[in-house]
């Protein structure tokens, strides 16, 4: 059988060859609308349904821990193993992004704008991923920025200062400066889908200092998020509520830069881990008890960071410069 990494672990735990919808959708062998393997797509790669694992929803039972392992670990017999989910789908369950209109922006190593949807509405031209969610009859749209906190950490290494120290010294949000950073350190996905593009600093002069370059990095990721946000409506997705998660969300400057670029408030959860592991635990609870999506609640919100309305025009102008600079940079490859 063809198994994804977590499904190989599942095979060892349960003896069952099973995959779940959200991860399997990324193989391109799944008919995402029908939530089933596609015989046509499998045939295009010389594969057949007989080679594929059984598909389940993330909240369904995929098997039980093998008796041998249960005995070794001191567990009762019959411990349920849920279908589970891919990293971002599980994070969405953890943070309560499970119904149309809800979304989160993750500022981790990569940047992700993830929006839940109650229908399959792809638009390949946008480079927005359209996959099955980890919950039944639910899909998601996802824009991906390959370098978010990764870009900040890269610059922090060059500056020889901790990333938190760099962002903590910035003070209140300012209009984007002339220095411009394109965060394509390893190519880019949404909306360009360009593996060859590479990053760049532009408009540097004698006055450019560490703080200006730090702001440029943060302000370079903000329009990248806006690109994903702007692509969503063509997939039929309208974002009504946005929550920020990930290490980068600890920087108020960065979150407000994104909020101002999107012209949309961003909510910050109270302290706690509401990521993929928490979402996986919720999926396990659903599988073990029959609980429904109602347990995937939104965490307590500590505060909301509003866009700076005095700066939305400046950030819109910076986004236009950012988009134009991509075209110029692409021509140099």
Residues covered by each model-derived region:
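Short linear loop/turn motifs
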Residues: 53-61, 168-171
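Active-site core segments that coordinate phosphate-bearing ligands/cofactors
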Residues: 1-19, 23-24, 28-39, 43-46, ...
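Short beta-strand to alpha-helix junction loop
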Residues: 31-34, 58-62
């Amino acid at each position: 059988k063809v198994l994804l990494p977590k499904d190989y672990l599942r095979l060892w735990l349960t003896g069952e060859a099973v995959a779940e919808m959200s991860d399997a959708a990324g193989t391109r062998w799944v008919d995402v609308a029908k939530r089933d393997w596609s015989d046509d797509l499998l045939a295009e790669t010389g594969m057949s349904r007989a080679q594929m694992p059984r598909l389940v929803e993330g909240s369904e039972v995929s098997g039980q821990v093998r008796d041998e392992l249960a005995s070794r670990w001191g567990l009762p017999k019959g411990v349920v193993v849920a279908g589970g989910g891919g990293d971002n789908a599980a994070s969405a369950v953890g943070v309560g992004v499970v119904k149309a209109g809800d979304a989160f922006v993750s500022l981790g190593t990569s940047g992700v704008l993830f929006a839940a949807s109650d229908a399959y509405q792809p638009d390949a031209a946008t480079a927005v991923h359209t996959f099955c969610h980890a919950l039944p009859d639910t899909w998601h749209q996802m824009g991906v920025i390959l370098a978010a906190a990764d870009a900040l950490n890269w610059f922090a290494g060059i500056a020889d200062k901790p990333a938190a120290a760099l962002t903590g010294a910035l003070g209140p949000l300012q209009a984007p400066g002339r220095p411009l950073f394109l965060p394509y350190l390893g190519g880019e996905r949404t909306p360009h889908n360009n593996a060859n593009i590479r990053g760049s600093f532009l408009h540097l002069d004698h006055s450019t200092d560490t703080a200006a370059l730090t702001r440029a990095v943060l302000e370079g990721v903000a329009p990248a998020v806006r690109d994903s946000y702007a692509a969503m409506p063509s997939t039929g997705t309208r974002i009504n509520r946005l929550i920020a998660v990930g290490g980068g969300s600890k920087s108020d400057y960065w979150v407000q830069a994104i909020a101002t670029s999107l012209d949309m408030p961003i909510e910050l959860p109270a302290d706690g881990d509401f990521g993929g592991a928490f979402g996986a635990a919720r999926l396990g609870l659903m599988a073990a008890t029959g609980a429904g999506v109602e347990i995937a609640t939104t965490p307590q919100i500590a505060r909301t960071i509003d866009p700076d309305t005095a700066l939305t025009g400046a950030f819109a102008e910076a986004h236009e410069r950012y988009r134009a600079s991509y075209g110029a940079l692409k021509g140099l490859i």
